[in-house]
Amino acid sequence: MYNIHSHYEHIFSFLKTVVKDPVLLSFYPFGSTKFENVEYMHCNGDGTSPVIVCYDQEPILDSCVETFRQVKQMYSPGGDRSIILLNTETNSKIKNKLLEEFKFGDCSCFFHIFAAADWYRGYQHCVELIDPSKRKIKKKYITFNRITGNSRAYRSLFVAELDKNNLIEHGHVSYSDTCPEHGHYSTSIHEIIEKHNVSTEYVLACKTILDSITFPLRIDFKDTALIPNGSQTLNAIPEMMESFLHVVTETCFWETKDHLTEKIFKPIVARQPFVLLGCANNLKYLKNYGFKTFDSWWDESYDKIQDPVERIQAVVKIIKDICAMPEDELEATLRGMQYVLNYNYNLFYSKEFVQREWNNLKQSLTQAVVQHPPRSPGGTPILDHLYISLDNTPAEYQTGISV
């Protein structure tokens, strides 16, 4: 089992075995992104050790610029001191841009493996999670859409597509017409046009569809004004158990990056088949961690579609095909999928799953520190402050080392 609350203490303890007097910055409370939310772990060093900035709870966006600028100004105003950005995305266009701008080192891991392993560990014992072979299907799909503004305004387009295809009545759909953080969809949906180069005609058509829907669309929390954050729990378990397909609407969608959160693990814990609305190629990213998906039952080429609207529409096509199937056929399909559902469930709950990512994190941190070592005020590497033998370190770690 893993305890996410001591995650940064574990990282700091490991860093002290790699380099002398490391400094580690993390953000608290969970999900914070501002410099004022930084918490520090450090030794009484001489100011030459690398600074590791743990910006791994949230995706890297343009709005991170000010936070990173303040980190740079405080710890390396002259650019002499190494700063390493521990993050949770790969193949990221925006990350590469900011690494170059601030001259930060890169270190990545899949943070939400650790978070989800902690948050969802108790669901192994939840009697409400029914074996897939014994479920009675009443709804064809389920989807949760709490934050619907800013970069997640694509969820408004998705719900509009569901309604356009007469699919809402066939599923359990949760959608914030008034986003808890960004206000009413009538404002945020217009921002899609300029921010993401989506045609005005299409966006306005989606708004017209949304205007015709009777809100609220809720699965649970029907008596609250706003849908509360449920990242750390499985919400609406009875409704999940009577739904065939889980439509995961991820945090990142428009960007070019590999980035997933705890959301992708919810159907895995619940042993539900799923489709993924996220960045292009993120289903492939998930499979790289050993999970199986559902290309034996439907076309998963949607994952490769670069155009965001076409990707939404391809997923809606899968939902529509499923909605055309009778419940008894879906129950039989679920039984036929059970080996995949059990495989994913067992992988997630295996000790090896978290251990493998922890090993990856240690390797990535070691590589980053070797590439961005302690430096003197003039910028000269101080290699005797490294506690690892460069002679026994893989060659790819040694890029950037000069004496």
PLM regions: where:
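Pol beta-like nucleotidyltransferase catalytic core
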Residues: M1-L234, E239-V248, W254-V403
